[in-house]
């Protein structure tokens, strides 16, 4: 389990308040406007025809609201929601037990659907397409197949790795949507709404400071709000102002772009130890004491989103924007690549003043504010 404050993966303490903070309807749901518009039309059409909604696949980074949307879909349809996950369905019989206990029009939510094993997935195909189960009874020459009719239902699948879904499974979803990262103004609304529910007085400036550091992810925004609330309660008058939020986040070691100490250590190692790269991910991970999986799945995606790190065929490379953010000199080899000149073999001590490349850094930097 990832214990970092800034991870978008679910942590145990998130479960305590996530349920109370979740919106119940599409009207309350903030962000993902295109997805909301489409779902509103599809749900109203299904209700008008008195048919189940087509199966829905939601994919995208963790913490963006896939589970919440599944709950909202069931609420808007006025039916029950049954929740499970790919790893929890180990055998075809487990899936059969779930499907045969559904009521007509129910919504079945399978989180991490990409982790279904192949035998279970093959049982799911006819259930999604024909609302039936094909079960083999017996073995050898005495084996026979029987078909069990199922109530018509809607499957909502969620995954952070859509590329791992097999084509037959993906093709059986009628509605497929990617969830995008949230803008700071959307996160600010989410934080102010959560503050009201939690009984916290938060000023817009304080909410904005938290939003800018939340990596475009509501789960992280709510987590930071709870920690800033603690600082406001103990060190101030209980009000989350801009000043209180900045001081609390400084103590939590979250910088203005949402980088924590793990992100900063990786960038500093890449720039100082390996002259900006390229360097293999195994070597880079070992240099900061992290596993390769943690670097690839947890640390790198946000750094690439900001334009601070590139994955290349030769290895990982820092960018001039990363050097400017950390306030460190730009290695000469990295600067040569930026300018399109042949780069000499990089040296950890061969660098160029960050002042001299300020214009390039400003052009390369990406900001959520834009």
Curated annotation (Swiss-Prot):
Keywords: ATP-binding, Cytoplasm, DNA damage, DNA recombination, DNA repair, DNA-binding, Hydrolase, Nucleotide-binding. Mg(2+) binds at residue 67. Residues 256-370 are annotated as: Head domain (RuvB-H). GO terms for molecular function: ATP binding; ATP hydrolysis activity; four-way junction DNA binding; four-way junction helicase activity. It catalyses: ATP + H2O = ADP + phosphate + H(+). It holds the Pfam family RuvB_C. The keyword Plastid does not apply. One of its GO terms (biological process) is DNA recombination. Residues 1-182 are annotated as: Large ATPase domain (RuvB-L). It is an enzyme of class 3 (hydrolase). GO terms for cellular component: cytoplasm; Holliday junction resolvase complex. Its main location: cytoplasm. SMART domains: AAA (SM00382). Gene3D superfamilies: 1.10.8.60, P-loop containing nucleotide triphosphate hydrolases, Winged helix-like DNA-binding domain superfamily/Winged helix DNA-binding domain. Residues 183-253 are annotated as: Small ATPAse domain (RuvB-S). Has 3 domains, the large (RuvB-L) and small ATPase (RuvB-S) domains and the C-terminal head (RuvB-H) domain. The head domain binds DNA, while the ATPase domains jointly bind ATP, ADP or are empty depending on the state of the subunit in the translocation cycle. During a single DNA translocation step the structure of each domain remains the same, but their relative positions change. The RuvA-RuvB-RuvC complex processes Holliday junction (HJ) DNA during genetic recombination and DNA repair, while the RuvA-RuvB complex plays an important role in the rescue of blocked DNA replication forks via replication fork reversal (RFR). RuvA specifically binds to HJ cruciform DNA, conferring on it an open structure. The RuvB hexamer acts as an ATP-dependent pump, pulling dsDNA into and through the RuvAB complex. RuvB forms 2 homohexamers on either side of HJ DNA bound by 1 or 2 RuvA tetramers; 4 subunits per hexamer contact DNA at a time. Homohexamer. Forms an RuvA(8)-RuvB(12)-Holliday junction (HJ) complex. HJ DNA is sandwiched between 2 RuvA tetramers; dsDNA enters through RuvA and exits via RuvB. An RuvB hexamer assembles on each DNA strand where it exits the tetramer. Each RuvB hexamer is contacted by two RuvA subunits (via domain III) on 2 adjacent RuvB subunits; this complex drives branch migration. In the full resolvosome a probable DNA-RuvA(4)-RuvB(12)-RuvC(2) complex forms which resolves the HJ. Belongs to the RuvB family. This is Holliday junction branch migration complex subunit RuvB. The gene is ruvB.
